[in-house]
C-alpha cells in the first residue's frame, strides 16, 4: 500500500471492507458507525508531540441516524460517538504505519465534553496528536484528540489508547 497523506470517503469505505491495509489488519467500522467522511491530513511527523498528527472531518446533516433517537424532541449527537471517532482514527494511524492486526480501543485518560453537536451544524473536525506508538509484539498507539463543530472545540480526550492484535481470542 502506498502511504497517502489524505483519504477520501471511498478510501475510508475500502478500509471498512478490509481492503486498504489488507485482510486481518486495521479496519474502520462500516456506516453507520463510521464517524469520519474524510482524512484531510495524516503525517508521522508534527503535531503537539512531534510524533504524528491527523485531521479528519465528518459532514453533519439533520438526517444522520442518531438525531432521530437521541433524543426525541431534543436531537443531539451522542458525545460517545465523537470519542469513538477519535479511537477509530488512532487505529487507522497504526494501520497506516504498516502495523499488522485488528484494532481495539483500550481506553483513555481524561475526556471532557463542553459543547454539543446539533442537527443545524455543518462539520465536525477531529484533530489527533500522536504521543507514542509501540510497534513490537504489542502494537499500541497513544494520542490526544479534540473534536470541533463548525470551528469551535467541544470535546477533548487525553491518552486515547488503541491496540492492534493478530488474535482477539483473549478478549
From Swiss-Prot:
InterPro entries, sorted: FabA (IPR010083), FabA_FabZ (IPR013114), HotDog_dom_sf (IPR029069)
EC numbers, comma separated: 4.2.1.59, 5.3.3.14
Assembly notes: Homodimer.
Active site: residue positions: 70
Protein name listed in UniProt: 3-hydroxydecanoyl-[acyl-carrier-protein] dehydratase
Record family assignment: Belongs to the thioester dehydratase family. FabA subfamily.
Free-text function comment from the UniProt entry: Necessary for the introduction of cis unsaturation into fatty acids. Catalyzes the dehydration of (3R)-3-hydroxydecanoyl-ACP to E-(2)-decenoyl-ACP and then its isomerization to Z-(3)-decenoyl-ACP. Can catalyze the dehydratase reaction for beta-hydroxyacyl-ACPs with saturated chain lengths up to 16:0, being most active on intermediate chain length.
Amino acid at each position: 500500500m502506498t502511504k497517502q497523506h489524505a483519504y477520501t470517503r471511498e478510501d475510508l469505505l475500502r478500509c471498512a471492507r478490509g481492503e486498504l491495509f489488507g485482510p486481518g489488519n486495521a479496519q474502520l467500522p462500516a456506516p453507520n458507525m463510521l464517524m469520519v467522511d474524510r482524512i484531510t491530513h495524516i503525517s508521522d511527523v508534527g503535531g503537539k508531540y512531534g510524533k504524528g498528527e491527523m485531521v479528519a472531518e465528518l459532514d453533519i446533516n439533520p438526517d444522520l441516524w442518531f438525531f432521530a433517537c437521541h433524543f426525541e424532541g431534543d436531537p443531539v449527537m451522542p458525545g460517545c460517538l465523537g470519542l469513538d471517532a477519535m479511537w477509530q482514527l488512532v487505529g487507522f494511524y497504526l494501520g497506516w504505519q504498516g502495523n499488522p492486526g485488528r484494532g481495539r480501543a483500550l481506553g483513555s485518560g481524561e475526556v471532557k465534553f463542553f459543547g454539543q453537536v446539533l442537527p443545524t451544524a455543518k462539520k465536525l473536525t477531529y484533530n489527533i496528536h500522536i504521543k507514542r506508538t509501540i510497534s513490537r509484539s504489542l502494537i499500541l498507539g497513544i494520542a490526544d484528540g479534540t473534536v470541533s463543530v463548525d470551528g469551535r472545540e467541544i470535546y477533548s480526550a487525553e491518552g486515547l489508547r488503541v491496540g492492534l492484535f493478530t488474535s482477539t481470542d483473549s478478549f
